[in-house]
A protein has these predicted regions:
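Transmembrane beta-strands of outer-membrane beta-barrel pores
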Residues: 45-49, 69, 88-90, 97-103, ...
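Predominantly the C-terminal beta-signal and adjacent terminal strand-loop region
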Residues: 201-253
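Residues that define the transmembrane beta-barrel architecture of outer-membrane proteins
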Residues: 35-37, 76-80, 119-123, 137, ...
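Repeated loop/turn-to-beta-strand initiation elements of outer-membrane beta-barrel proteins
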Residues: 90-93, 136-137, 183-187, 217-220
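Flexible, solvent-exposed loop segments that connect beta-strands
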Residues: 52-70, 101-118, 149-165, 231-238
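Short glycine/proline- and aromatic-enriched beta-strand/turn motifs that initiate or cap beta-hairpins
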Residues: 27-99, 248-252
Length: 253
């Protein structure tokens, strides 16, 4: 048996208004959440080695530096590494701070030896746009700057020492790809390049990581990172690279 229920226009209007009012807070909340800034901070340890050559100024000896992470631990003065990301809708900002202080010895002609110390600080700042490639995958395309400060000192016992304090800025372009492997597992690959004789002759870096979600806003990561720079100016040369595993923890808020 079919039962008919009569509704007056006033009742229908009230019902429609009630349904719209009931739905408005959820829609507004979703829109507000999508437009809100989201941040994440990742302090990490970089078990890096150092390979390259240093000539602090024209006429100074060129010293080759080649140290593994275990070698660096013996002479490491200090190190600090942290990465941060901010997102709002499809826009993304990223910053990465890296500091490492190392030293080494090298043989010179005539039976002499030289001591080399390098203090390298870099700050990479980029901004760009995020694209969703699939429900599990997204890519950030960004551009920005890498600021360098490199302090180098070469000393020859009984002869003398030479110092160099070099600061410069490199333009960089960057890409970051993320893929969700499983509900709590993801992988991340990042690469950038720049310099192109604006600051340094050339600089580039790449790193990849596998990430595990421990809690809603906490992730742990393991991966590998390589960073390289080749700077030459008026006889001065700073050409070195750093490579090694990374271990970090990410906090989202």
């Amino acid at each position: 048996m079919t039962q008919y229920i009569n509704t007056t226009p006033g009742m229908a209007t009230a019902a429609l208004a009630a349904s719209l009012l009931a739905g408005t807070p959820a829609w507004a909340q979703d829109k507000t959440a999508a437009d809100a800034w989201r941040f994440q901070l990742t302090p990490y340890a970089w078990m890096t080695g150092l390979d390259g050559s240093v000539r602090p100024f024209r006429g100074a000896p060129t010293v080759s530096v080649n140290k593994s992470f275990s070698d660096i631990l013996e002479d490491l003065d200090a190190a600090a590494f942290v990465n941060g990301t901010a997102r709002k809708g499809q826009y993304v900002l990223q910053g990465d701070f890296s500091y490492a202080a190392t030293s080494d010895k090298a043989a010179l002609p005539l039976g002499l030896s030289a001591n080399a110390k390098i203090r390298q600080t870099s700050l990479t700042m980029t901004g760009g746009h995020n694209w969703m490639l699939s429900p599990q995958s997204s890519v950030d395309l960004m551009a920005g700057l890498r600021l360098w400060q490199i302090k180098a000192e070469v000393s020859v016992p009984g002869v003398g020492s030479a110092q160099s304090n070099t600061s410069f800025v490199d333009p960089v372009v960057a890409a970051r790809w993320r893929y969700d492997i499983a509900p709590r597992w993801s992988t991340l690959v990042y690469a950038d390049m720049g310099g192109l004789d604006v600051g340094s002759k050339f600089t580039w870096q790449v790193h990849g990581s596998v990430n595990y979600q421990v809690k809603e806003n906490i992730f742990v990561s393991v991966g590998y990172r390589h960073l390289s720079v080749d700077y030459r100016d008026d006889g001065k040369r700073l050409d070195f690279s750093q490579s090694g595993p990374i271990v970090g923890a990410t906090f989202r808020f």
